[in-house]
Regions:
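Short acidic/histidine-rich motifs immediately flanking catalytic phosphotransfer sites
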Residues: 70-76
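Structural recognition of the beta-strand scaffold that forms the well-ordered cores
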Residues: 76-77, 106
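A hydrophobic C-terminal alpha-helical subdomain
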Residues: 230-292
Length: 292
């Protein structure tokens, strides 16, 4: 599972949570030529001290893309959160191809598609298309929703005693950020050919089940309240969210209702060598965070 450990392996966005986890996994698995790309190399001094080459790499700076990808054999492109991320990521793919990179892994999202109702997922679709058109080998890692996000969403639910959603009872296959980062590192170390992979937890979890987990772990009763998409949109806007951001969240719930988030695969175990952590175990492990 580490046949490419002696190739030059680049991780973009290496100063972020995902990037740091991916670099740490590459180090743990014996990679010998790791390049960590970041807009601010000074922020990765601790990583450089571990023998990792740190390069300035800014998706909005063509010059840094050229030097950042130079001499790289295989690269992990971690999707950005910028409003212009489609353009950013297309530029990164073009730079990788121009530099002679032979393989790209990319952190995408479930059922990436160009439809108007796809919300921010359309950005992932167009990046996937750019990667496919580049003629390189690739693994498109369609990461499902992070289990970590349920810690952030717990506060309002525990305060109000209600967990609102428009999923129509559809499940989500929550996967931890750590598991997805280990999976991405494993793909960088071992994947060949061209593949699209859903990266999931061990089983889908409905919002009703999530509410029950919150209740069990905190002793505070949380009840799931199902809404229509329009009701969810109105409620989010009333809570102060901008309309465009509320629409993204509603689109995400709509995808869960359609079953797009209920897929289960062995990708985590295949590329990391570990079984994915279940949401219940993750929340139990982080129970203290629910009390904050």
């Amino acid at each position: 599972m580490t046949q490419f450990k002696d190739k030059t392996l680049l991780v973009t966005g290496a100063a972020g949570k995902f990037g740091r986890l991916a670099v740490a996994e590459l180090l743990a698995r014996g990679a010998t030529r790791i390049v960590a790309g970041t807009r601010d190399p000074a922020g990765l001094a601790d990583v450089a001290a571990q023998g990792v080459e740190v390069r300035r790499l800014d998706f909005d700076d063509a010059a840094s893309l050229g030097s950042g990808f130079a001499g790289v054999d295989r690269a992990l492109i971690i999707s950005t959160v910028a409003a212009n991320r489609t353009e950013q990521q297309r530029a990164a793919v073009a730079a990788a191809k121009a530099a002679g990179v032979g393989y790209l892994a990319y952190t995408s999202a479930p059922y990436a598609r160009p439809n108007a109702d796809a919300g921010g997922i359309a950005d992932h679709y167009w990046t996937e298309q750019a990667i496919a058109a580049a003629g390189l080998d690739f693994t498109l890692l369609r990461n499902h929703i992070y289990a970590d996000m349920t810690l952030q969403g717990a506060g309002p639910a525990l305060t109000s005693g209600q967990l609102f959603d428009a999923t129509d009872g559809g499940g989500r296959n929550y996967v931890t950020r750590a598991d997805t980062a280990r999976t991405a590192a494993g793909a960088l170390l071992s994947a060949t050919g061209r593949d699209i992979v859903d990266v999931t937890g061990p089983a889908p979890v409905t919002q009703e089940q999530l509410a029950a987990l919150y209740t069990k772990l905190t002793g505070k009763t949380v009840t799931r309240v199902g809404l229509t998409g329009d009701q969810m949109q109105a409620g989010l806007e009333a809570a102060g969210l901008p309309a465009f951001y509320a629409a993204l969240l509603v689109a995400f719930d709509r995808d869960a209702a359609a079953g797009y988030h209920a897929v289960t695969t062995d990708a985590v175990e295949r590329y990391s060598g570990r079984k994915p952590q279940a949401l219940a175990d993750f929340l139990e492990e982080n129970k203290a965070a629910l009390a904050q």
